[in-house]
């Protein structure tokens, strides 16, 4: 394996995307999601990038690439459709000690951008060492089907519990046993079904900690738009009036 798997904190760091097309747009948006200070070099921006620039979320550097654009940059992504320009970006970045990723050119990448399956703070990455983005995309889609929004809720609960349990001073072995027992319980099934009282009961029974899910915003998000007192499963979409009208139009065929 060539690449060392690592998570980089780029919040507040200057990151440069060279190329203002659709590929550059995707790269810039992903950098923004991680809190980077993003600049984009290109003659014309896509509509989405133009909107980000007008909102002050990115800096547009009009024109063609110049080595001076790398001054003070933490990492750069080369996303132009000119291979010679991309090669020059990589060469200049190496000379200046700037981390570089050249799109569709794994031999000129100091780092790769894996496919992401994200549920809140839960992030699962898929990387193929740059050999097959298509396979990485397929695996990401399968992961998204397997790990739904209930995992985001569980992670919120685990994060809330972690400090409280560690502060009891029971030792790492006992703490690990408690956490593993909780994630191996039926708590995920209760979350999927919106059975919040059962979720709280399972947590109390296994950990000895009484938690209130409401301050975490969990119950509110799980029951949003449901005013009839019934439990709404996490991740399930309720039929809207528009959906209902569409369903009424579908009639069974006569024999």
Regions found by a protein language model. Give the residues of each.
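Hydrophobic, well-ordered beta-alpha structural blocks that scaffold small-molecule cofactor pockets
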Residues: 1-44, 49-53
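Residue-level detector of alpha-helix initiation sites
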Residues: 22-23, 84, 130
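Short loop/edge segments at beta-strand edges and connector loops
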Residues: 42, 60-64, 104
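Glycine-rich, highly charged phosphate/nucleotide-binding loops
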Residues: 53-71
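ADP-ribose/adenylate-binding Rossmann-like module
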Residues: 75-79, 86-112
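E1/E1-like adenylate-forming module used to activate ubiquitin-like modifiers
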Residues: 102-152
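An accessory alpha-helical subdomain
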Residues: 130-223
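Intrinsically disordered, low-complexity terminal tails and inter-domain linkers enriched
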Residues: 215-254
